[in-house]
Amino acid sequence: MHVTVDDPAFEQLIDPLVKIRSTMDQHSSAIDQATLARFITEGFFLSHLKQMRRLYAERREFFIKEFNKLLSDRFILQIPEAGLNFVAWLRCEADFARVARVRAEIGIKPSPLSFYCIQAKLKPAFVFGFAAWTPAQIRESLVKLASALK
């Protein structure tokens, strides 16, 4: 449905759209804003960023090492300069359906790269995240996936 300003239906849409926008665009409370401002001005935000960068760098390196040790026979891990995800390209395209089925069966959730594409036809790959997981959880998941794919 396409409605223009000249359309009589336009007037009927104003109130519902205003309500939707006011619900969607609610701002943080003054106390939340003041707390965040203090968090930033007193240096806690910078400290937090440094801590998280260090943590994510450790997890990133751990993921790369473990992934390559356990799964390099099935995947080529693309290592970006930055970010919290990796793309793992299947060495054998015919394995895509099996890997997709196995990951669902064992509860590991790398997304197929195709989920992020509208029209592009890419070679089969999966997107793995690492930031939310401890090294022990990363190892456990990768071992589980490698074992299930043998």
Q: Language model features by range: what are they?
A:
Residues 1-150:
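PLP-dependent class I/II
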